[in-house]
UniProtKB/Swiss-Prot annotation:
PANTHER family: ANKYRIN REPEAT AND MYND DOMAIN-CONTAINING PROTEIN 2. GO terms for cellular component: cilium. Keywords: ANK repeat, Cell projection, Cilium, Metal-binding, Repeat, Zinc, Zinc-finger. Residues 374-384 have a biased composition (Basic and acidic residues). May be involved in the trafficking of signaling proteins to the cilia. ANK repeats lie at residues 45-74, 79-108, 159-188. Its main location: other. Transmembrane segments: none annotated. It is found in: Cell projection, Cilium. One of its GO terms (molecular function) is enzyme binding. The gene is ANKMY2. This is Ankyrin repeat and MYND domain-containing protein 2. A zinc finger (MYND-type) spans 320-357. Interacts with the retinal-specific guanylyl cyclase GC1.
């Protein structure tokens, strides 16, 4: 391989770096076809065109450069940054994923000893951290699609590798979401197929625990997904697909507050069944979950998610009540308290939500009334502060004082009128549309 020196750029290579920032993919493609352009050329800081594209959030440029042979693991930057680090710093989830699929190494460190995931966490790009921590190379799964040793058949049929890889790399571990991913792919909705899938997951789990660099986090994730698969198998027996029944069982809430007890028990059971009792992660999970009464915080799902994906609990973001997808923005139009991804999730959850929707609506209206009352009190306090400041500035008038006779009786009448109007507006808040609908937040 020819050694490329930093800063020694041809005119066309300089133009390429400019086009990456401001130009089009077509212009970049034209320049890359030139003999005077090296796809892995280095600027004065040791940055390749791919690093520039990743840092600037240019997804199509990144794909183009990778197709032309860009080195995703180039380590010539003056501070040891890689293309994956720049992608993570930019906060672009798609580019981070593209870099990982192209073979980006996740354990490489920069000059201050930080990996790409650690750099992303440092600047608050938690979504990128989750993607990096949960990435599982397709090659590791493809290993099981070929007969090994004395085996006559592969442990995993090649046609199942794609759908299974999609589930393995998901960052949403909600049991309903996993069942939905199984249900949406006809290849997985067969008892025999899921039997092979869960056995492969168990093999990967075992390998993660017995390898030299033990990976407890990945092992726990594989075991957890395997347990959900085994639950799905119970609803696929005799050639019948009853996964919708399983989803309803996972969502069904108890009468008092709508908490999904069965879902909580399933997650706790899967953690308890982890076969490696000496694992530090298992002991941490048990210590966090065991003392908590079912229905109280933290839930088993939130503890498990934080342990496996590294998602930060204090980030102000909403999650879908049905499938746990991050960034949900639709609210129930009646109670305004429950959030969904879309109407599909809302309709799926309505069978259990309708039992407590009215109670939640009453709670919401009470909160709104209290919030409006506090706001009105703050405004009144603000007016009083302004009036007292004005009186203090006018010392002679303050000393003389103002008699009740000089005060305007109409002021108190107007104050009462404003108060009545405000109360009427608040009563109007109690009117809400009926029926299971979702509204924008």
């Amino acid at each position: 391989m020819v050694h490329i020196k930093k800063g020694e750029l041809t005119q066309e290579e300089k133009e390429l770096l400019e086009v990456i920032g401001k130009g089009t993919v077509q212009e970049a493609g034209t320049l890359l076809s030139s003999k005077n352009v090296r796809v892995n050329c280095l600027d004065e800081n040791g940055m390749t065109p791919l690093m520039h594209a990743a840092y600037k959030g240019k997804l199509d440029m990144c794909k183009l450069l990778l197709r032309h042979g860009a080195d995703v693991n180039c380590h010539q930057h003056e501070h040891g940054y890689t293309a994956l680090m720049f992608a993570a710093l930019s906060g672009n989830k798609d580019i981070t994923w593209v870099m990982l699929e192209a073979g980006a190494e996740t354990d490489v460190v920069n000059s201050v000893g930080r990996t790409a995931a650690q750099m992303a966490a440092f600047v608050g790009q938690h979504d990128c951290v989750t993607i990096i921590n949960n990435f599982f190379p397709r090659e590791r799964l493809d290993y099981y699609t070929k007969p090994q040793g004395l085996d006559k058949e592969p442990k995993l049929p090649p046609k199942l590798a794609g759908p299974l890889h999609k589930i393995i790399t998901t960052t949403n571990l909600h049991p309903v979401k996993i069942v939905m991913l199984v249900n949406e792919n006809p290849l997985l909705t067969e008892e025999a197929a899921l039997n092979k899938c869960y056995r492969v997951m168990d093999l990967i789990c075992e390998k993660c625990m017995k390898q030299r660099d033990m990976n407890e986090v990945l092992a726990m994730k594989m075991h957890y997904i395997s347990c959900i698969f085994q639950k799905c198998i119970n609803f696929l027996k005799d050639g019948e697909n009853k996964l919708d029944t399983l989803i309803k069982s996972l969502l069904k809430g108890r009468a008092s507050d709508g908490f999904p007890v069965y879902q909580e028990k399933i997650i706790r059971e899967s953690i308890r069944k982890f076969p490696y009792c000496e694992a530090t992660l298992l002991q941490q999970l048990v210590r966090s979950i065991a003392p908590v009464e079912i229905g109280s915080d933290p839930t088993a799902f939130s503890v498990l998610t934080q342990a496996i994906t590294g998602q930060v609990g204090f980030v102000d973001v909403e999650f879908c009540t049905t499938c746990g997808e991050k960034g949900a923005s639709k609210r129930c139009s009646v109670c305004k308290m429950v959030i969904y991804c879309d109407q599909t999730c809302q309709k799926t959850h309505w069978f259990t939500h309708k039992k407590i929707c009215k109670n939640l609506k009453d709670i919401y209206e009470k909160q709104q009334l209290e919030a409006a009352k506090e706001k009105r009190q703050e405004e009144n306090h603000g007016k009083l502060d302004v009036n007292s400041n004005c009186v203090n500035e006018e010392q002679p008038e303050a000393e003389v004082g103002i008699s009740q006779k000089d005060s305007n009786p109409e002021d108190s009448g107007e104050g009462k009128k404003e108060s009545l109007e405000s109360e009427a507006e608040l009563e109007g808040l109690q009117d809400a549309p009926a029926g299971p609908q979702v509204s924008e937040e």
